[in-house]
A protein has these predicted regions:
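Internal acidic/polar
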Residues: 104-126, 196-200
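Structural recognition of an alpha-helix C-terminal capping motif at a helix-to-coil junction
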Residues: 45, 59-66, 80-92
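Sigma70-family region 2
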Residues: 25, 62-82, 100-102
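Arg/Lys-rich amphipathic alpha helix in sigma70-family domain 2
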Residues: 87-109, 185
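Helix-turn-helix DNA-binding module
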Residues: 154-171
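Solvent-exposed, charged amphipathic helical/linker segments at domain boundaries
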Residues: 170, 176-272
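A short pre-motif secondary-structure segment
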Residues: 147-148
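A short, charge-rich alpha-helical start-of-domain segment used by transcription regulators
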Residues: 9-45, 55-58
Length: 347
């Protein structure tokens, strides 16, 4: 990649000043991610309760973190409750995406019912991490879903929830009442929610024979440590993204970046790849064990997703979830496989 003084003023390209600031920004973002680690798992759990798949939850988390970094860079006052701040950003991001899609109309209403502030303890709390709860939650309209999760799972007060969702405590009470009533009614229905109600959004590539064949070819190239073969499976304009940390575009960047880091001679680990199906999608799991360590155990350390090119058996985008500990844990753990997580940043 050409940078700096190779370009005269006013010509296309990256100036020295831009290159230097990009390095500073990249390190600042990594420091920011590390600073948020204490609350990240809780914020991911909140995103997961709103979304139908692990992939959608991580997308929402990453968009939330990106917006949080931009907002933090413009704040002069301290952030008094980091988790609540991130939950507010995540909620607004999620609701905005629904509004843009035209799938839902979002209005607050205040009921005339005199509802208690907290109500009786709800059995939702004991089921907070169960997939059955997530399915039931998807029966609720967006704002009711957010209110139920924030109150019954995360134990925020009505005033705190009202602040996060930019509404009134009375409207939160009303949404909680309606949402809890819907969930209790659903629990009494032995048939449970219909698959149509809780199914994730369309994923055209999932389960498609051509998509699985592409993943198997890519996994075979990984296992052969054949970087030339790996690169040949990408579009010329293809992308490789280490989610939350790095993006590479084009054969040259992809070869020099993630592929050489993982499969080059200086890598500290030995890798092996397998193809699996999880949460509606065919994926690649990357296994690793330490090089030159006799008897070292092999564990899943990464989850990879491929977006195929339109009309061609090539990779348009490859996502590595190496620095997404919640995704690695949910996917590998859900498949009953040993795994390790890797923090949230290179440094």
């Amino acid at each position: 990649m050409t940078t700096g003084t190779d370009f005269e003023a006013g010509t296309p390209g990256e100036t020295q000043a831009l290159a230097e600031n990009r390095v500073i920004l990249r390190q600042a973002r990594r420091d920011f991610l590390v600073a948020l680690e204490p609350v990240r798992a809780s914020v991911y759990a909140y995103c997961r309760s709103l979304t139908p798949t692990v992939w959608d939850a991580e997308d929402l988390l990453q968009e939330t973190l990106t917006k949080a970094l931009a907002e933090a860079s413009q704040r002069y006052e301290p952030i008094r409750n980091t988790q609540a701040w991130l939950v507010r950003i995540a909620t607004n991001t999620w609701i905005d995406s629904l509004r843009r899609s035209g799938r839902v109309t979002l209005e607050w209403t205040e009921s005339a019912l005199d509802l208690p502030d907290d109500g009786a303890a709800d059995p939702l709390e004991a089921l907070a991490v169960e997939s059955a709860l997530r399915q039931l939650l998807h029966l609720l309209p967006p704002r009711e879903r957010a209110c139920v999760v924030l109150k019954d799972v995360f134990s925020y007060s009505l005033a705190e929830i009202a602040g996060m969702l930019e509404t009134t405590p009375g409207a939160v009470k009303s949404a909680l009442h309606r949402g809890r009533a819907t969930l209790r009614a659903a629990r009494t229905d032995s048939a449970g929610p219909s698959p149509e109600t809780v199914a994730p959004g369309p994923r055209a590539a999932a389960g498609h024979p051509g998509h699985q064949a592409l993943l198997r070819r890519l996994a075979a190239a990984f296992n052969a440590y054949d970087i030339d073969a790996m690169v040949s499976l990408f579009l010329a304009s293809g992308r490789s993204e280490v989610v939350g940390n790095a993006t590479e575009t084009g054969h040259g960047e992809i070869r020099a970046g993630s592929l050489t880091d993982t499969f080059g001679p200086d890598a500290a680990e030995i890798h092996r790849s397998t193809v699996h199906h999880f949460d509606g999608e065919d994926i690649i799991l990357m296994w690793e064990r330490q090089k030159n360590v006799p008897g070292a155990s092999e564990v899943v350390s990464d989850v990879l997703r491929v977006r195929p090119a339109f009309g061609a058996p090539l990779v348009a985008e490859l996502k590595w979830y190496f620095f997404c500990p919640e995704v690695v844990a949910e996917v590998a753990g859900g498949l009953g496989l040993p795994f390790k997580t890797n923090g949230v940043s290179y440094f």
